């Protein structure tokens, strides 16, 4: 009996000590956690796999283009548009609708979406607009305020869509049309889906737009100057050309010397001209060799020697084959039908 009492007594003592110990530990960790800085770690499902996947492009492919981050590559083969996911190698054919023909496609500047234009084969003056989301292989048509498809009626069935620019965050669209008489029309599609003619001239060259502003930017090729709609912003007494814009709505223009770029001026059009930053080249450059990424880095391509130079650091980065695109993170090139990538990070 005495032995049983001792066992019970020591069991109770052990239980009390254990409870006290757990209580103290709990309070300690509670206090510690309350005074500990917690860092959130996000794992993005779209992070590129480390394993290299061979991406092959048909040698007879045309209009080979990359999405803004290089995750997707598109090309035409036998008039058929194909999109390839460079992360996993999957392919998707983008088909036109019934009685329609795909006549234009372009990757948007800040998303893995494309803008598509389809011509109605029964009424060839009518062009219907679509967006293609490469992430889910989904093609949809944007609509106006009455839920009607956005359709542009050309003046002539021989007119061609030559460019479409969209400020991604605003919901408007500019469409450049090359007419059969040699002129260019610029159509403006507003946030309500209404389309009007904005400009009509033989003198319109390259066109562009900002990410968060509604202004259209275009080259006036007669006067060799850059113009911006709904703005008095203009550089006088210099021949200039449009190069690009970046994610921060900075405008990049080239100052020309004998048709080649001597220096780059960039900055916000909300500031005065004298506030622009200037980058001067030692030698003039062909504007087609100048790339400006979404994060505002400037690269100059030397296709003969196979390298690009980052302007800020003067660092030369080699690549193989033909340059396809420079993104914020990589240089994409093609060599004998194979997609190659050089990491910039």
Task: Show the residue positions of the predicted features.
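Sequence/structural signature of beta-propeller modules
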Residues: 1-60
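Surface-exposed loop/turn elements that mediate protein-protein interactions on large endomembrane-trafficking
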Residues: 27-53, 78-96, 126-154, 178-203, ...
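Beta-strand-rich domains and repeat architectures in extracellular enzymes and scaffolds
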Residues: 49-82
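Extracytoplasmic/periplasmic ligand-binding sensor domains
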Residues: 54-57, 83, 89, 104, ...
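Signature of short aromatic-glycine-proline-rich micro-motifs recurring in repeat-based ectodomains
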Residues: 60-63, 158-164
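Hydrophobic core register within WD40 beta-propeller blades
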Residues: 64, 105, 164, 207-208, ...
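Conserved loop/turn motif of beta-propeller repeat scaffolds
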Residues: 69-73, 111, 169-170, 212-213, ...
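Long amphipathic alpha-helical scaffold regions
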Residues: 92-116
């Amino acid at each position: 009996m005495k032995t049983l009492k001792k066992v019970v007594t020591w069991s109770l003592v052990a239980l009390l000590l254990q409870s006290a110990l757990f209580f103290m530990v709990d309070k300690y960790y509670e206090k510690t956690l309350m005074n500990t800085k917690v860092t959130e770690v996000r794992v993005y499902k779209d992070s590129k796999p480390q394993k290299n996947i061979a991406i092959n492009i048909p040698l007879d492919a045309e209009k080979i283009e990359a999405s803004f981050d290089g995750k997707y590559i598109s090309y035409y083969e036998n008039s058929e548009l194909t999109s390839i996911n460079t992360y996993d190698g999957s392919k998707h054919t983008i088909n036109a609708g019934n009685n329609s023909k795909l006549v234009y496609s372009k990757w948007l500047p800040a998303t893995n979406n494309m803008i598509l234009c389809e011509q109605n084969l029964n009424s060839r003056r009518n062009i219907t607009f679509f967006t293609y989301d490469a992430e889910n292989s989904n093609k949809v048509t944007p609509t106006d305020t009455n839920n009607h498809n956005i359709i542009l009626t050309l003046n002539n069935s021989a007119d061609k869509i030559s460019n479409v620019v969209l400020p991604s965050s605003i919901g408007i669209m500019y469409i450049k049309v090359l007419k059969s008489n040699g002129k260019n029309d610029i159509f403006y599609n507003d946030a309500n889906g209404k389309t009007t003619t904005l400009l009509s001239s033989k003198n319109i060259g390259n066109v562009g737009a900002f990410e968060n502003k509604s202004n259209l930017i275009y080259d006036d090729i007669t006067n060799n100057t850059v113009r911006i709609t709904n703005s008095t912003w203009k550089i006088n007494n210099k021949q200039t050309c449009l190069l690009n814009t970046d994610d921060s709505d900075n405008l990049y223009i080239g100052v020309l010397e004998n048709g080649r770029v001597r220096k780059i001026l960039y900055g916000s059009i909300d500031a005065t001209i004298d506030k622009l930053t200037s980058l001067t080249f030692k030698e003039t450059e062909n504007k087609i060799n100048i790339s400006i990424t979404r994060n505002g880095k400037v690269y100059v391509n030397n296709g003969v020697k196979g390298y690009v130079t980052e302007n800020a650091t003067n660092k030369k980065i080699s690549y193989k084959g033909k340059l396809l695109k420079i993104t914020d993170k990589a240089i994409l090139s093609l060599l004998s039908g194979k997609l190659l990538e050089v990491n910039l990070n």
